[in-house]
């Protein structure tokens, strides 16, 4: 076994993370392009696509978060040279992806239907429902794509997903233009056209990734047969993956509830709040991408029973993610005006956003911290802690505190949106502390098992 080198591990982690980060940026940018191009078409379509996206993401991540655990399984099994285990894991997650697609589609349809009862403008409602239905048509394919992406991630083969995601972004722009504005003899579809474009692209990249898997000779031994998965194995897969999906769902819904609760504070306040959240989501594509790579590295070292490398990669990954987050935070703080002006020229919105900027820097630092810790714990297959910690931090600490500070005078004068951001920051801080404590306990237990092997 080669001697562990901090510098070599850092280089490998960065090299491995880069394609994952690019993939995540490309997928995030697709949603941004949908919103921008719909906004240029009509204000109603902008509102509808924004609303539709806020419905889509929380429901989708419930399934997505469940199947990304395949990467940790494959990394561990590859390290143990367990080809049959890898084949079975791929079969289980593919089967699970298809099964989960059904409730995801039903939930999307149900929520879009429930919008009819909350007094939304009829025209906006029609576009929103059409956009969500279009996205729902691509759910099975995007789930299958993410299964194969996670599978390849576990094998540390990440470039093909990066190329496909980048290609999807490039294809998204002309297809959106054709379908939104009704070119090449097609009718104008507005925001609904953006949803149809996304569904088409999701189907296309899923087919491309399946073809890549089937054509690559090294992966022939991993091809699953067409028999049904073993019941006990499938249930185990579900119980490992589902808490991971619930953790992402809890976070997304938490942010949505904050946005809804803050809505009475006015349009400028909500605009500033959404700009801040958008900035944090862009930052997360970087730190979250590294965290996804860390999950694989940790799973691999556990499979090799290499306690020295396991300890080393945990320390390096946390230091790397927090260092990057700190640098980004400093840049955002000192160039806040420039960043915010990219989103708006409304002076009222800019002033409100500038008042939030320090809290945003703290938010993204603690968010990066919890991303790193969650990534490591996923590598340990401890997904329950990844779920329970944010459930406590966000819902039992962050949300109540934010509500009290923002909308009541129980502690101090009403702080408005800044009060909600104090709640966001404290919720993430508590989540990060809990995850750190859990990690230290899990790490000691894992090291003890590796030593006793």
From Swiss-Prot:
Compartments reported by the entry: Cell inner membrane
Keywords, alphabetical: Antiport, Cell inner membrane, Cell membrane, Ion transport, Membrane, Transmembrane, Transmembrane helix, Transport
Molecular function per GO: antiporter activity; xenobiotic transmembrane transporter activity
Keyword Repeat: no
Keyword Cell membrane: yes
Topology of this chain in the membrane: Multi-pass membrane protein
Pfam families, sorted: MatE
InterPro entries linked: MATE_fam (IPR002528), MATE_MdtK (IPR050222), MdtK-like (IPR048279)
Any GO BP annotation: monoatomic ion transport
Residue intervals passing through the bilayer: 13-35, 50-72, 93-115, 125-147, 160-182, 192-214, 238-260, 275-297, 318-340, 350-372, 385-407, 417-439
GO cellular component: plasma membrane
Family: Belongs to the multi antimicrobial extrusion (MATE) (TC 2.A.66.1) family.
Protein function: Multidrug efflux pump.
Descriptive protein name: Probable multidrug resistance protein NorM
Organism field: Photorhabdus laumondii subsp. laumondii (strain DSM 15139 / CIP 105565 / TT01)
